[in-house]
Amino acid sequence: MQKSYLLNTIGFLFSLLFCLPSFAAQTEAPLPDTFAEHKIVLQISDSDPFKQTLVLNVAGNLQRYYGADNVDIEVVAFGPGVRLMFDGNTNSQRINTLMDSGIRFSACQNTINHMAKKLGYTPKIQKNVGIVPAGAGRILQLNAAGWQILKP
């Protein structure tokens, strides 16, 4: 009886060992394919309109400074910063213009879920904004892949 229990336990542990990496891979957003010399992730976690405008200014300024072909930029929003990416936000047109120039925008699914509970409805996120499982996790994922983090 003990031998059977031990074998089942070992089998279960080995199955976990091989399954967990596939579960972890499913929770992370894929890394962008980039050959840019500079890779920058901008964090916005504040609902202050001044800081939200600042992060958009920095994104555009960095792209102009390095040149669109030489820099890859992703703006990641979590916490109150997700409001920047709400559909109909006063910066929606500006975000569209920056996206058209190649800058990516990502919003935190955890924050959206939390806001939905508080608001009683799921807030609509601007079209073409990527949704990532966790905004802070996305920033760390990009940093581990060599991206520089800026929090203007």
Located regions from the model:
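Bacterial N-terminal signal peptides that target proteins for export
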Residues: 1-10
